[in-house]
Amino acid sequence: MAFWQSKTLAQMSATEWESLCDGCGKCCLNKLIDDETEDLYYTNAACLLLDHQTAGCQHYSDRFTHVPQCTVITIDNIHELTWLPDSCAYRRLAAGRELPSWHPLLTGSKEAMHLAGMSIQGKVVDERRVKDIEDHIVLWPLKDVD
């Protein structure tokens, strides 16, 4: 039985916890919240550290030096981070769900995730190039695709 099936999130080692991240890059996108409805909207404006082809952070180990507001996902805050996509492994496991079929821990690579359209690969622009963020709201797959 795989560690994510036999352990709670709180029981996982730091290495196991980190490996849950599929590397989709969606958490690194700028998001908007409608003032009236409180609806959440993702944009294709990506963090300046996000590699647009690999969907990985270019300076992960020292990202807080470059982006102090970068969020650390922990067992203590996972239930508060409602802006994480429904497909996020942390959210799914916290809700008692399984990993999606395309998750790198199940497939052995990120390729299935990219092919399923579940990553930001090739879909984003550098946030520094965005003038009007509302023009960058996206509708591409943000929900679960199992």
Curated annotation (Swiss-Prot):
Upper classification of the organism: Bacteria, Pseudomonadati, Pseudomonadota, Gammaproteobacteria, Alteromonadales
Domain of life (superkingdom): Bacteria
Protein name, UniProt field: UPF0260 protein Sbal_1871
Family note: Belongs to the UPF0260 family.
InterPro entries in alphabetical order: Puta_zinc/iron-chelating_dom, UCP006173
